Amino acid sequence: MIKGYSHKPMGTVALGTHLGNFSKEDSLKYVEAIKYAVRNGIYSIDGAINYRGMCSERDEGVALAELINSGVITREEVFISSKAGLLYGDISAKLPPMKYLSEKLENKGISIEDFSEYEGLFQTLNPAFYEIALNKSLENLGLEMIDVYYIHIPEITKSKLTEDEFYEKMEILIGWYEAKCFEGKIRYYGIAFEFMVEEPFENKWHIEIERIKNIARKVSGEKNHFKYILFEYNIMCDWAETVKTQMIDGVKMTMIEACKALELETVASMPFAMGDGFKKYALSDMLDFVSKKMNHVIVGSKNPKHIEEILRYWRGNLSECSGRQRFSGT
């Protein structure tokens, strides 16, 4: 297991590992893409335990080990984020999520009753599940610590509970997160939203981030480790900038405004709208749109040519970015 954690802040641009199939060919592409990205200045890599049946995390682990063992980088020079909360499978063991639950999780006290379901996604706030997932993610990545560990799509569970029930469960889970930060397994944590920002007028998805921040303060004071909010934001989905859904100190704000007020860093997912944006906009237009409002953006790719195109944009066009730091590629 590789010791240490990133001594750099999250990069303005991160490489995402969500897309692709379970094939060895795609895994080889991801390993090479990650190595290419890191060698050329994209030092932040984002994943999740459920991505590609754990293949994505394992591909990250292979790439990181090769880069670090060959002396190209040190652990302190890369920033690794992952996510937990959704039921996952293990493609290498030929275990889809439900079979993984019955064969690997039920004997550890996790049952289907722990999860809430929406459109085939099963989400839980049970800390016991996160404990198992975190240890598995660390194993997959070959690391002793993850720099950011997100709570993945908690809106699914929220939609099935009363307000009080949901925030009570979140307080217990945040207590677990803070404990893992003090143990040295997690550096920071955050929330990766999906439906709340995509469907801002659906009250069932709504979560008050000020209330979550106050829970973190209650659990661990002002030096708590709750730092990042991830959500879809692109030229075709701009609700986070245009709709005032959050209340901060009695003032209605947009998600982006609320995060800034709470000193939470914003992370944009799906900057190209799952590829649909290319039908109407140039890559530079879409990245311009995102970088002016968000601190960080995750760009998913396993294609070095695509990564190079993104690198060219960032090297030449980041002067207007409102993120907390400039792109550090060389």
What are these regions (language model features)?
Residues K3-K8, V38-R39, L64-R75, E139-L143, ...:
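Acidic (Asp/Glu)-rich catalytic clusters
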